[in-house]
Amino acid sequence: MQSINFRTARGNLSEVLNNVEAGEEVEITRRGREPAVIVSKATFEAYKKAALDAEFASLFDTLDSTNKELVNR
């Protein structure tokens, strides 16, 4: 992952976006702040889907446990 500061990113935005389009993740740092990461839309959507899948799996595990407890009463 490439890591650059905000000023460099702003001055080279076209190049940064070209790198992201080519599949690279770019971290942008700002003095005293949490860094941000730029990724392609496809990568971002894959991350979101994975997070939602994990959340649904957790919910289904909870529901399954609850159902088993109710059946075994």
From Swiss-Prot:
| Any single GO CC term annotated in Swiss-Prot or TrEMBL for this entry | protein-DNA complex
User: Which is a Pfam family this sequence falls into?
Assistant: PhdYeFM_antitox
Keyword set includes Transcription: yes
Q: Which GO terms describe its molecular function?
A: DNA binding; DNA-binding transcription repressor activity; protein homodimerization activity; sequence-specific DNA binding; toxin sequestering activity
Identify the stretch annotated as signal peptide in this record: none
Gene3D superfamilies from the entry? YefM-like domain
Entry's Gene Ontology BP terms:
negative regulation of DNA-templated transcription
User: How does it get modified post-translation?
Assistant: Degraded by the ClpXP protease.
The observed outcome of changing F44A is: Significantly decreases repressor activity, binds DNA less well, inhibits doc normally
The miscellaneous comment for this protein is:
The concentration of phd in P1 lysogens is far greater than that of the toxin it antagonizes. Such an excess may assure the well-being of carriers of the addicting plasmid.
Q: How does it assemble?
A: Homodimer. Interacts with cognate toxin doc, the exact ratio of doc:phd varies from 1:1 to 1:3. Interaction with doc prevents both kinase activity and dephosphorylation of EF-Tu.
Family listed: Belongs to the phD/YefM antitoxin family.
State the protein's name: Antitoxin phd
